[in-house]
Amino acid sequence: VRPNISLIKDIGGKTNKGIIIDEKCQTSIPDIYAAGDYCESIDISSGESKLMALLPNAYMQGECAGMNMSGADYVFQKAIPMNSIGLFGKHVMTAGTYSGQVYHESDGKNYKKLFYSDNRLNGFIIIGNIEKAGIYTALIRERTPLDTLDFELICKKPGLMAFSKKVRT
């Protein structure tokens, strides 16, 4: 599926595979904002501008664009690529980018691979039990420094107890 970007392109706006927006969801044309599946934004896990046609990203972009159109000074810097699917009776979830050092575990039923560098979680691939994948997604989206939590515990048994008491309260 390719987004229809002709409207913005025809009036001189910057485009690539999608409409280029900045961290305030503004296009290259002053006072014109865009949000959703046809926008390219910065993937915080890789630093690259890309299309990420995903509901959570579109929702947050819409909030950002709406706030800025109403005069606020709001920044959206939490876009990450994510996918989740059920396949052959297994749940599969991925998020972020697959670069950096690797933590890997597999027990025959479940598979987990975490990618991290520069004291941050960059991405993950989980097959099987994806119940706690939201914790990893939040760590990526919030750019949480890994030295502020028990990273070994987060890798093996993700849960709120791995976070400092300050973060949990």
Spans of features found by a protein language model:
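An exposure/low-complexity boundary signal
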Residues: 61, 65-68, 160-169
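C-terminal auxiliary extensions adjacent to catalytic cores
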Residues: 108-167
